[in-house]
Amino acid sequence: MNKNENAEQPTIVKYVEGNYGGIQLMSLSRYALGYVVRGSKQIYYGDTHYTVSRGDVFYMGVGNHYVENLPDEGRPFEQIVVYYSPELLQRILLQLNMSYGMNITNTHHCERCRRLNHVAVAASPTLRSFFMHTASYLQDDNFMHDETAESIKMTELIYLIVSHEDDCLKSKVLSNVDSSHDNFEQIIHSNIFHDVSIEDLAAMCNRSLTSFKKEFKRHYFVPPHR
């Protein structure tokens, strides 16, 4: 991962590994969503390992991961990975709710979600199509340096995940919403998926309606909508 990347922007990367590199330590400072195009990936927890197969979408949390990328019968291992910060995820979820009226919820909880720092599921047709189209975009050098295009693709990816039925992948992604923001953002995020008026939100934040609207736009770059 590029250590100098802007943590406020997603980074979309295509990896092609022609040579087998064995088990490697991967240290993540941001969350990762990826898709295995060819080959398979092993993720290790001590003596236990989990397989991410071709056509699977995977999530990897912040921290250290021991991974092994396996080529496919002499053909290079290939994957597409999107890195994102919790702050960016929170802004995207807020945009989906405020601009498109999405009521984003999750009721899925399981032992594997709680215990493991990754999850892998078979990609739905829409997610598979998303990653394959993204692969074609990555062939254009201009896309790789276009932060707006990356943000649009990131929003699309999060939409496809959170609009899907509740599962491990959706649960893991939604668990990444940052809880360390100041009180203003905590109040907003705690209530954006409920039927709360702008006036009520302003009162909860101890702001006048005018001050609330100004501060909301400063935090989220869009005005609040009723």
List each model region and its residues.
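Short, leucine-enriched amphipathic alpha-helices that occur as contiguous helical runs
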Residues: 177-185
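Short, Lys/Arg-enriched N-terminal segment that forms or immediately precedes the first helix
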Residues: 17, 165-172
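Aromatic- and histidine-enriched alpha-helix N-cap/loop-to-helix transition segments
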Residues: 28-31, 152, 179
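Amphipathic alpha-helical segments enriched in hydrophobic/aromatic residues interleaved with Lys/Arg
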Residues: 96-156, 160, 186
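Conserved phosphate/pyrophosphate-binding and hydrolysis machinery centered on Walker-type P-loop NTPases
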Residues: 147-151, 174, 205
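N-terminal regulatory/effector-sensing and dimerization cores
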Residues: 6-106
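Basic/polar phosphate-binding segments, predominantly the helix-turn-helix DNA-binding elements
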Residues: 160-167, 187-191, 195-226
